[in-house]
């Protein structure tokens, strides 16, 4: 590695029983390679599935706070991609969700690169063994009470036994749906541009769209503003309150994500315009 002076290994210490051992292993490994090492402590009050979401949010907030134009390299592999796509399908998702983990993404003013997304976990473990590189594994990854672990330990191995090319096929699926979603969003962005005024989206313009197209326009508009996007039931409430109520009604709807990965949003009607306000409690 030529740019070791600019390369920093960032470790997240989740302050559980094995955290100190994990941090020591990573620090020693980086010292051997002359790589700068930093550790950030993350303390989470909740447990279970809530812990995973809260920890993910704190990690992303730390990555956002890094110096502008940082390039963040993460180690997600193709087995992680299978897990993510299946998990999203089970929870209910659309094109964007099925497109999975992106190879390149933005977090704040920084860029995330995931160069191993097409590599299998098996290939990575084989490389580590061949090169005699020691590694540690989080014992909580074996706890199948976590939904993702259940998929990883119980479901995905059985799928692989039946369909040996699942890694390549899911990778192909995510690339296709990513391109399809990009085309779809390009169409919706043109609609948003037509409907925009200085405050938000015009109610009359939105009413000219059919119900599904209207809901997709509103979702993408909010997504572009980096706020919480409504789920199916919240979208039905928006439809009823803003587009099926009396013209003189002035509805206000407030919603947020339970994992707080994005700020909450308040939707209201002001002067025949659908207006969005952010809130973060």
Locate predicted features.
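Internal, active-site/partner-interface "lid" segment
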Residues: 141-149, 167-178
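Conserved anion/nucleotide-ligand pocket segment
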Residues: 152-154, 158-170
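AMP-forming adenylation/ATP pyrophosphatase catalytic core
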Residues: 8-12, 42-44, 58, 105-109, ...
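Short helix-capping/linker segments at secondary-structure and domain boundaries
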Residues: 2-3, 160-165, 222-230
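Core alpha/beta nucleotide-donor-binding catalytic domains of modification enzymes
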Residues: 1-154
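Generic solvent-exposed, charged/amphipathic alpha-helical segments
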Residues: 27, 64, 156, 219-223, ...
């Amino acid at each position: 590695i030529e740019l070791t002076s600019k390369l920093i290994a960032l470790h997240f210490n989740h302050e559980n029983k094995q955290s100190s051992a994990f941090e020591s292993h990573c620090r020693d490994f980086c010292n051997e390679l002359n790589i700068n090492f930093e550790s950030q402590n993350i303390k989470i009050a909740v447990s279970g599935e809530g812990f995973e979401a809260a920890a993910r949010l704190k990690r992303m907030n730390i990555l956002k706070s890094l110096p502008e134009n940082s390039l963040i390299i993460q180690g997600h592999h193709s087995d992680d991609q299978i897990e993510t796509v299946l998990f999203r399908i089970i929870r209910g998702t659309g094109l964007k969700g099925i497109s999975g983990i992106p190879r390149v993404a933005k977090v704040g003013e920084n860029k995330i690169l995931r160069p191993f997304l097409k590599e299998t976990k098996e290939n990575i473990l084989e490389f580590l063994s061949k090169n005699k590189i020691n590694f540690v594994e989080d014992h909580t990854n074996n706890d199948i009470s976590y939904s993702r672990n259940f998929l990883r330990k119980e479901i995905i191995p059985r799928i692989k036994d039946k369909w040996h090319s699942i890694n390549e096929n899911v990778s192909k699926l995510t690339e296709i749906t990513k391109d399809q979603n990009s085309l779809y969003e390009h169409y919706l962005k043109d609609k948003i541009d037509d409907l925009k005024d200085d405050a938000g989206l015009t109610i009359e313009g939105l009413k000219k769209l059919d119900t599904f197209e209207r809901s997709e326009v509103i979702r993408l508009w909010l997504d572009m503003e980096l706020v919480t996007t409504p789920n199916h039931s919240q979208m039905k409430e928006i439809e009823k309150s803003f587009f099926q109520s009396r013209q003189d009604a002035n509805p206000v709807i407030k919603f947020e994500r339970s994992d707080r990965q994005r700020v909450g949003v308040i939707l209201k009607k002001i002067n025949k315009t659908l207006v969005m306000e952010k809130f973060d409690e």
